[in-house]
């Protein structure tokens, strides 16, 4: 997929996963690539492990609203599998879901009152929506890079393969957003995410 006149992103995760940092980097990348960009965030109970949702829109013309409607997302970037299922309806036909393989088990599941949905649910949702599903082992790749907290940058690396924006632009924007002492870690994490969907 390459950016047409407009590219819509929905990023979803759980508090503490770096969803908002990822959306800020994605917005910076769009601006650096010459797009008009709008972004919105819903923090929910982010500090307590609740859902975090961010919408980002790139457009070659003006973006008038940051909100991505249901069925309009070109890319759904999910930092956790159940969050991917909860927000799958935002994906449009021909879109791509980039999903971290991480599972954060909610209390209802750990208490035995519900079952955590398996990967087949994600695959079926993607097929039903006419979308593509890319599963990425974000935590494993981030750990191999040096720190599990870099999983958000691993996932951005995977997303970068879908877009016609140079790797140098991505890295420049990442470098502007992360502390200098973590630059090498994040370079490695980004490269491993790109390689995961090559």
Residue locations for each model-derived region?
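Active-site cofactor/cluster-binding pocket
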Residues: 1-198
